[in-house]
């Protein structure tokens, strides 16, 4: 879960933390060049986000992807639609730690209990619960449904347009 975890999987057993960090730095360098060309948005996501934005809803991103990758994806696919966006940094721990979600809520001037967090992994949902937010599991993501359910979603939805029911 996250690019650093991917780097750990890419090195042989017994690799040092320094070697893992080197692989991670190389990955981040290549991501800007190649990663975005291999990335696409989920069908219907842009239209849904534009509708939420038009309704005046505050929108944020909190991802386990490294911060630069988050900013790149946001700029390419969703420019001007999000009020805040963050990824993993030295000061923002990976989910399921709730700190990143709480930071986003603070930056948008929102109480966590009035926020819904939409996630496609069980760690997303655990983070939402840990932050005191509504945990909405999205079934169109990368994790199998049974694994997603281990995060105890408050609600499951099946398509980006279903997000509009929360607005």
Could you tell me what each predicted segment is?
Residues 18, 51-57, 66-167:
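Asp-based, Mg2+/Mn2+-dependent phosphohydrolase catalytic module
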């Amino acid at each position: 879960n996250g690019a650093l975890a991917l780097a750990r999987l890419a090195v042989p057993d017994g690799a040092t933390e320094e070697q893992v960090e080197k692989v991670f730095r190389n990955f981040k360098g290549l991501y800007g060049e190649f990663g975005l060309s291999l990335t696409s948005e989920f069908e219907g996501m842009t239209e849904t986000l534009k509708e939420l934005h038009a309704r005046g809803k505050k929108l944020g991103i909190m991802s386990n992807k490294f911060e630069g990758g988050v900013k790149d994806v946001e700029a390419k696919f969703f420019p001007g639609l999000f009020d805040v966006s963050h990824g993993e940094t030295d000061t923002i721990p990976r989910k399921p730690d709730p700190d990143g979600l709480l930071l986003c809520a603070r930056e948008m001037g929102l109480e966590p209990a009035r926020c819904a967090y939409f996630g496609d992994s069980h760690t997303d949902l655990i983070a939402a619960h840990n932050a005191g937010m509504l945990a909405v599991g999205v079934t169109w993501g990368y994790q199998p449904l049974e694994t997603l359910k281990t995060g105890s979603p408050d609600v499951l939805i099946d398509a980006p347009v279903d997000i509009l029911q929360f607005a």
